[in-house]
């Protein structure tokens, strides 16, 4: 994502928080919880290098070192929400989503999650199967969570007194190679992976 997108995202978050602060000041009340949809992309890159033991626990975010501008923006915005909570008493709830998937999700164009991209690649193969491209060696692990479970977890957080951050994802880790094998089996199409390093 470009810098303008990051700027827009930060501006939106700041405007939401600032408007709530002003409203609370005028009304003398502070009852509206504000939800922030964070991302596991804010975790340090070095925490995720070992595919057999990624460290994405909520307390492992620091020292900060996300691997993309998107991750840095998510981390900054999360800190912004916590600052407004501390300094202005605004009740916030903060999540860190891990690879949420389901219907109506993006499935092409380069912004799709791994399950959608792999399903699309396999679906586009002829009935006899073929080759699909996989980034990296395929041993990188991910936690995937279906959208309905994500919504339920988010709702529970909103109903609780805990502000977060809370990881919302599956405890089960799946390698990209395993995901391609599952997709191949379900589709009934044999595949060979071309690993793009």
What residues fall within each predicted segment?
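Active-site Tyr-X1-5-Lys
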Residues: 17-19, 23, 65-98, 117-128
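Short-chain dehydrogenase/reductase
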Residues: 6-10, 56, 62, 66-78, ...
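Conserved small/polar residues in nucleotide/adenosyl-binding loops
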Residues: 1-5
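Conserved active-site region of classical short-chain dehydrogenase/reductase
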Residues: 10, 14-18, 79, 116, ...
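C-terminal substrate-binding subdomain of Rossmann-fold SDR/epimerase-dehydratase oxidoreductases
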Residues: 124-197
